């Protein structure tokens, strides 16, 4: 068993798609549009086969994204080693996005940073623990 995909509603479908393409090497499928209900979406696929569905509806209610709440709180991407976390985090910061923590080693041993995407969704960027332990397997 595996998770097939995760979906999230966004206000600016194209900007979010570009964000994940630029920083996380996502490959977008064809845009789906259902004009009758004002819905559109992209499936983004990542190198390991994981997928994220970005969805937009013209009649959405966007509430503040509290960091301390129940429900899904972030998406985490493993990007390689610590140097990769540092490099990607720095690029995201230099491009004007907010870094809310790190890069740092957490109390439970993860090397990570946490950033906000264009719409304030929390994204963790982590080092692959297998690489950090000397394994060549991702």
Regions found by a protein language model. Name each.
Residues 12-25, 59-63, 89, 121-127:
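Short N-terminal helix-initiation segments at or just after the protein's N-terminus
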Residues 2-11, 42-45, 65-138:
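Vicinal oxygen chelate
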Residues 29-30, 54, 59-64, 132-135:
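A short, acidic/glycine-rich surface segment
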Residues 47-49, 55-57, 128:
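Generic beta-structure capping elements
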Residues 7, 58, 81, 119, ...:
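Short, flexible active-site-adjacent loop segments at beta-strand->alpha-helix junctions, enriched
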Residues 9-51:
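Core segments of cupin and vicinal oxygen chelate
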Residues 4, 29, 73, 100-101:
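A short, local hydrophobic-aromatic micro-motif
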């Amino acid at each position: 068993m595996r998770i097939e995909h995760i979906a999230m509603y966004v206000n600016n479908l194209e900007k979010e798609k570009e964000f994940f393409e630029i920083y996380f090497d996502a490959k977008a499928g064809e845009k789906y549009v259902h004009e009758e209900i004002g819905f559109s979406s992209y499936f983004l696929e990542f190198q390991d086969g994981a997928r994220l569905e970005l969805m937009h509806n013209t009649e959405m209610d966007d509430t503040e994204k509290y960091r301390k709440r129940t429900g899904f709180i972030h998406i985490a991407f493993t990007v390689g080693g610590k140097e990769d976390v540092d490099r990607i985090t720095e690029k995201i910061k230099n491009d004007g996005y907010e870094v809310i923590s790190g890069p740092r080693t957490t109390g439970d041993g993860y090397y990570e940073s946490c950033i906000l995407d264009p719409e304030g969704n929390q994204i963790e960027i982590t080092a692959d623990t297998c690489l950090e332990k000397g394994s060549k397997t991702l």
